Regions:
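Alpha-helical transmembrane segments and their membrane-interface junctions
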Residues: 99-115, 169-190
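Alpha-helical transmembrane segments
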Residues: 12-15, 46-61, 112-131
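Membrane-helix boundary/juxtamembrane motif in polytopic membrane proteins
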Residues: 119, 142-167
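Active-site and channel-lining beta-strand-loop segments
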Residues: 23-54, 141-153
Length: 209
């Protein structure tokens, strides 16, 4: 009998591969060299062969999904299981892959797109997904997920996990709001969020010793 997790896993692979039909249908209309990377002014600064993008990218993301899910499952088997984390991992890669693939194909078909706004929205999505998950991790699960299994005082971790969670969710919301401004506002905001996360993580690490 297929478990709910296995069903979600198979669906995630379908979600990764399904957008490839968009690229295959429009293959003849796509340029031989496709733009795959862009600067803050929405100008392409990285190119790749058409076949590599249309067919290679989904296959690469499938392999990446297999690695992410495999490592997560291995970690759960040998350390502490984290069902919500596994579920989040299962769907982050397919969502990112689908949006990135569709955006890349659309841009190379000369559709007008704001690449940086799409990129910032994806980052905001990741921040909020992780931030929503973090407060569910117990101190023991956190310790087991790190090499050596060092203990962390429950009170310290309870405080830190909410700080991290609120920062990620709040930061994600602010990033979404920043797309109505300029690219540099979004970049600056990301820098502040990352710096805050590093400081909080250091506090949690030092406070446990």
């Amino acid at each position: 009998v297929m478990t709910k997790r296995n069903l979600q896993l198979w669906l995630s692979y379908i979600v990764i591969l399904l957008p490839m039909s968009y690229g295959v249908v429009n293959y003849a209309a796509l340029p031989a060299k496709m733009a795959i990377h862009f600067n803050l002014d929405n100008q392409p600064n990285g190119m790749a062969a058409k076949l590599l993008v249309v067919v290679g990218f989904p296959i690469m993301m499938m392999a990446f999904q297999l690695i992410c899910v495999g490592v997560t499952r291995l970690n759960a088997n040998h350390k502490a299981p984290a069902p919500r984390f596994e579920q989040m991992i299962i769907w982050i890669v397919p969502v990112l892959s689908s949006v990135i693939y569709a955006t890349t194909i659309s841009y190379n078909l000369d559709h007008q797109l704001d690449i940086w706004r799409i990129a910032v929205s994806l980052i905001a999505f990741i921040f909020m997904a992780i931030g929503n998950y973090l407060p569910t991790i117990s101190a023991n699960q956190y310790a087991q997920m790190h090499r050596g299994g060092h203990t962390i005082r429950p009170m310290i971790w309870r405080r830190v996990r909410y700080w991290l969670g609120y920062t990620l969710v709040g930061g994600g919301i602010l990033l979404l709001l920043s797309i109505v401004t300029t690219a540099w506002v979004s970049v600056s905001l990301m820098g502040i969020i990352v710096a805050a996360l590093v400081i909080m993580s250091l506090y949690g690490t030092l406070a446990r010793n």
